[in-house]
Amino acid sequence: MKQEENGESGFGRLRGGARRAVRVSTQALVVTDSLEPGRTFPLVLRPAIEGLDLAAWAAANREEVERRLLEHGAILFRGFDVRAPAQFERFARSISPELLDYRERAAPRKEVGRGVYTSTEYPADQPIPLHHEMSYSHNWPTKLWFYCDQPAGWGGRTPVACDRAVWNLIDPRIKERFIEKKVMYVRNYGEGVDLPWQEVFQTEDRALVEEYCRRSRAEFEWRGADRLRTRQLRQAVATHPRTGDTVWFNHAHMFHVSNLDPLVRNSLLAEFKEDELPRNAFYGDGTRIETSVLDEIRRVYREASFAFDWQRGDVLMLDNFLASHGREPYAGPRKILVAMAELYTNAECNRED
């Protein structure tokens, strides 16, 4: 382990005793570590003293946490006494007081606290590919936190990837094509296969859905009694607002029909046209994205990824520009919670008039 090298002030709390402020160096409170020798992504922070209050320490050392996050892209807080969703929420708010609601959903989640949700409630036997949270939307969270309330009995690891590495691994010709054309997402709600529009937009009022679409520059079309189609032209890459890093930032490989299990894909294509599928991705001009190109993106993510086993009480903090995340299949109960903060607005996709 390597000791934290700079900073002062923090707060310690001994188990069984009253909380008290302690003026000590950060070195004495937290040490840096790694999940394997030589690996700095994600950075691992552990308490150097028993009973350290993570939320209080983070509040007192917020600038240092922010600096580390921008440097590494991901921080795993391990060994701290975080044992309940309320403690997790308190820690997240110590960094970003205003947590975000989950709107324009792509997956089912349940809210378990103010701004705290279950992670994607997707079938346990299916993997979730690496992705940036809400990169299909007109705005997205800058910061993410994942909290392990209960690790899976088997599997359920979370792969993460440093997107500085991902960007460097992608063929320049693919980058150029996507930068020029961008990505068009087509979603069809009300087919009984994917999420209903009422859950995605968190309302049953059509007028509110239409207003949301107009403001986010998304085309919409009501089809029949309770069906909705949206088309959204979105970015393929993004630039970090603080570091200036350019990163691959889209959901094309996840929304595209090639991401489906072959049996499911063939069944859907036998019933629907490609633009009538529950979700699909095209180039921004409406032309098909080559499956071979998306397979290359998936290969790059696999090459850049690193998966770790959860321990109860772990908190993983991600910069949503600099790190992507996924989920491996699992068996048995598993409870991972998520919080999001600091909304980034894509000016090209937001209408103020």
Regions found by a protein language model. Name each.
Residues 67, 81-82:
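An N-terminal structural lobe/cap that precedes and organizes the functional/catalytic core
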